[in-house]
Amino acid sequence: MKKFILPMAALSLIAAAACTKNEFDSQNVQNNEGRTVLTVELPGETKTILGDAQGDVRPVLWSKGDQISVNGVASQALDIESNAASADFTLNAELTAPYSIIYPATMVKDGSSVITLPSQQKATSGDNIISGSLPMAGYSNTLSAKMGQLCGILGIHLKAGSQTGLIRYIEVTATGGEPVSGDFSVDCQYCKLSSEAQGVNVIRMEVQEALSTESASAFNVILPAGVYSQGFSVKVVDENGQAMIRNIGGSLELEAGKLMLMPELTFVPNGEEKGVEIATPEEWNSFATAYNAGKYPDSQIATITADLDFSSVSADKFVTLGLRDGAKQSPNGPAKYFAETLNGNGKKIINLKSDVPFIQAIGTGALVQDINIDKTCSFAPWYDGEKQLEFGSLIGYCSEGTVKNCTSAASITVSQCNAVANKVPLYIGGLIGRNRAASISGCTSSATIVSDATYVTDATAKTSLYIGGFTGYCSNPNGVLERCTNTGNISVASTALNIYVGGICARTSAGTIKGCINSGAITVSTGRTSGDPCKFIYLGGLFSVVDASGDEQYLKVIECSNSGDITSNSNVKQLIAGGIAAQLSTNKAEFTNTTNAGNITTTAALRNLFCGGLFGRISATQTLNLSGEPFTGTINIGPTESNKYAQLYCGGLIGQTTADVKVSGSATWKSSLSYVVKATAEDNIAAESFFGGICGCAYGASMSLSGMKSEGTIAIDTLKHTISGVGGIIGGGTKGTSISDCSNSSKVSVKENKAKTNGYSVHVGGIAGRIVGGDVNIKRCTNSARIESRHFNNKSWSSYNGNVAGGIVGSVGYSEGNTFPATIEDCHNSGTVYSLRGASGGIVGYVSKGTMTGCSFTGGITRSAPGGGIAGVANSCVISECYVKASIKTAAAGSTNADCGGIVGEAVSSTVDGCRYYGELIPAAKVSTGGIIGKADDASSAGVTTTCGFGGTINGTPVTTDNLNTHAIGSTTGKRGTFYLWNGTL
């Protein structure tokens, strides 16, 4: 075992001051003595680097992992803690002097005194060199030796011009033909290199770096020391194939250990570099095969120079570009992502029939641009069922890189391509299968995607199918989709357990998506039969599911839009559909100026439905700021499965929320929402259904709504739904709700159905349908539309399963034992209220523990259960400073408890203070009717703290000062206060 102490030579450093275009400056080498210490940057790699400048000298330092060759024997890897100028090397061999030493050992050829200089070099960050790239030699008769340099460095400093892309490579050519790579003999005693090789006079340095316009980047190209008779030619090529060539003429001597610095250059292209030219399918296959085998550097440029017609190439003969572990052409690895430039030059890919993407995978530094996949191309994605796979007609997987100005009009058919049922998720995109962290811009997919009924999944594995019109999956915060479009239609009949379909992207976890548009239609016709694993279908005009998670995951969606229709002809157990996204299950996403104009339609008897013009369901805390008219399409819900567990949640903007959500801004909904049922009384059973112009239902969590306007149409058929809520703004809330500064002019109607049902109730309101389970605040809201419920509930309204209708809200706290307070303040209704077999109020149909102040009603009421100008039924409430100018009439099919009051129809433990009524009260027979309260219990009173006034007629009898006290409260119970005659003048 031998140990050598080796001091390093030092490399001179020169300034760029007085350089001219055709000259280099140089300084003499200075040597540093001492022991060398090396550090490791990446495990298993050597790291010999240039140290910091010491005047005009930069020492070359050993680093951990370095190895030398002594008399053809490699030393052990150096194991030291920090960079230094000398080091002890150990060799596991008995060697005799003299000792010929070469560094690095990896360059030594077959234990000889010959080294191989690579024709490819890599740039490194800063003004430095890649470790292990600067060869040295030494010679000694003792165990201590001093190393000398064999090469010099050509220093190139570059700045970006006005239109500079990422720099692919720098190519240095010895114009006189001197060899700069290949095999060189080493004279270790005199530190000299010699070679007789021909045609190896070019060195390429891979750069893969964007330049700055402010400061120059330094690139150090290592060349054999010697005389270069005609100087050098330097070519700089960017990712777009733009080239700049600078010639350094005359005889130049590059001395060992010298840094020769070119004048600073600004990249100004004066040429074009096409690289590998591809004009035929055969040339494509040849290029892809060679690249996949590692025969091209990552700085390579390839250009498609003619349309490629693959009609004579069978699917099993086509070679995809790049390799992805688990994909067909690399099922068990390794992966090799394309990292070069592929310039499609606007050419078409024609008649390609394949089960793999045109490009399988791209990675860091890749640029793919101007490629058009023609409509004559068709794809049937391959998968083996064992590893997650992504498929796009252009690219399967984008790890990183750039994709620009590409299109696809291909057809993609997802079917059972393999005998093994799929056990892992499959991501399909019209253009891109999955975008991790690439920048994709200006691309269009008009690809048609069909997932037929033969695509089934392993029922035990419970796998998912993701289909996006443009891409299947966006998964990294560094990923970008900008100005991308999908116009292709998607049709799904698969029975995968979970099916996710989005017009732009199926699964969206992170990234920035800006200015993207979908106009492609989505149609699902999956037929559910016994034993099928399919349970959930998620359909989104832009995205199926948005599920960003993790500390660094975040999604930004900016100025995107959908106009593609969503149609479900499936009887699936659960459908979630949204014009922007089916499901929003993260609070790490923001949406700015994103809209939907597409229609949402269901036709088959599905069981559970979550549907919204923007979002089908929101299951994470969210703050949304909406403005303008974010949804202009229609929502048309057809028949649903008759099942006592069925649930329906549909909203003009949001179907259902299950987390705390705040919606604010100044948005207007002007569309139509309809639920049409053609069934008998025995059909259409459901547990609950909620419909609203803005939101269907806030379920199990609070919701805040402000500044929203509803100006559309809501038309609902209901039969045997245990609980239903319909509202111009929100259908229902199960944990309280805050609503402020909202208005409704949408006609809200629950249509007449001849079938009579027992105990299946509907609550309808101009702003909200049914709110329970939490504190309620409704302030500064208005309704001007007709609120109509013709649902025939054969049960009495008073048993907490009756119908309720209100001009502002149908019911608040309509549950036995309610303990939550409600505030309704400064709300006004000028629309009419019609309720068959239900309690009705000009402001609220039923309210518990409410405080109502400063409200007014100027429409009219027709009802067949308790009705009041402010509240149909008030339980434990305080009503003050409200006025009503309206008629209250009785509808057919009335009940015996259709009490009628100008302010409150029926009051339980409630007070009415400072309120006024003027109008016509037309009660049913044998009911209590009063100008202020129709029926009051002993705990209720009117005009206690301030006086109440009323006037008009009661059952045709004019109200006068003589009969005020008689007509103030219709029942004999209740405390009378002070009343005055009011003529309706405000």
Predicted regions and their residues:
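Sec-type signal peptide cleavage vicinity
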Residues: K2-L13, A17-A279, T289
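Surface-exposed repetitive/solenoidal architectures
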Residues: P269-L986
